Amino acid sequence: MKIIVSGAGAWGCALALSAARHPAGHAVTLWARDASQAERMRAERQNARYLPGLPFPPALTLASGDLAALWPGADLVIVATPMAALRGMLLALHGCTAPVAWLCKGFEAATGAESGGLLAHEVQALVAPRLLAGAFSGPSFAQEVALGQPTALVAASPHDRVRAALVGALHSPSLRVYANEDIVGVEVGGAVKNVLAIATGLCDGLALGLNARAALITRGLAEMTRLGVALGARPETFMGLSGLGDLVLTATGDLSRNRRVGLLLAQGRSLARTLESLGHVAEGVYSARTVARRAALLGVEMPITRAVVALLDGRLSPADAVALLMGRGPASELMH
């Protein structure tokens, strides 16, 4: 297969490495927006900034410049950009005939008081409706995928061709790829788990204990499921890799940037200093308000998400955010 990976950050490089090492012998091109970055990686045969010490295999080539020039004959284009850059990338890809899959997890920021923000497939439907597109998601850290450590991910798309392309390109002895038609559920899981991981990091940073962590993860999963079902997702999707799986990993893993946001805020660090220290995008910070707004427009109850938004906006201290959640009145566990 001929595979194009657009975006040379940690995730783009990790999947490019995985595809280039595939036993089927794929030809993989990693495209970088910055020509100097592409030249540096070409010379060093590694991404020294994000994945130092992991050499590029011979099947991986570097490119920059005109992305459209790479499309002819491509079997799959993987978009490895943050959510904020997805719209522009999809506009650039509007004439592409190969299957396209994005890696970003989140909601595009709302543009007005009446807008709740958009999931990736909703953005694509607006700006590039003819694309055969989908999402590639699930519980994974880029570093572990790049190292070839065992991982399971989900290829989500209503299009058989997109799911088949992702499975063919990336399913290997170290990376299991499961197919799912429910792109709404997969994207909601990927977006909301980042917000919930901030809450869990806050819990751990305040040393509230393992009971509290388990409660947050479980009730967070309920919030995620309620929002997803309201948006048309299948509830069983949230018991899978992109729901429960990604939530547990992001909420508990030490490599999680969103969890680290909560940890640092619990220590009294400002949000600005926290984001500056990360060096990478923490999508939960940018998605939290949009998730809360979309939920409000749909009448979906998401108290943990609302508390995270109040914390990020500076309206609640870490201790007050916890007190707000614990001070809520009794409710049925199976509330709909």
Curated annotation (Swiss-Prot):
Example GO molecular function: glycerol-3-phosphate dehydrogenase [NAD(P)+] activity
SUPFAM superfamilies hit by this protein: 6-phosphogluconate dehydrogenase C-terminal domain-like (SSF48179), NAD(P)-binding Rossmann-fold domains (SSF51735)
Gene Ontology, cellular component aspect: cytosol
Binding positions (sn-glycerol 3-phosphate): K105, G138, S140, K193, D246, S256, R257, N258
EC numbers for this chain: 1.1.1.94
Cysteine pairings via disulfide bonds: none
Subcellular location: Cytoplasm
Catalytic activity field: sn-glycerol 3-phosphate + NAD(+) = dihydroxyacetone phosphate + NADH + H(+); sn-glycerol 3-phosphate + NADP(+) = dihydroxyacetone phosphate + NADPH + H(+)
Active site: K193
Alphabetical list of InterPro entries matching this protein: 6-PGluconate_DH-like_C_sf, 6PGD_dom2, G3P_DH_NAD-dep, G3P_DH_NAD-dep_C, G3P_DH_NAD-dep_N, NAD(P)-bd_dom_sf
Protein known as: Glycerol-3-phosphate dehydrogenase [NAD(P)+]
Taxonomic source organism: Verminephrobacter eiseniae (strain EF01-2)
Gene that encodes the chain: gpsA
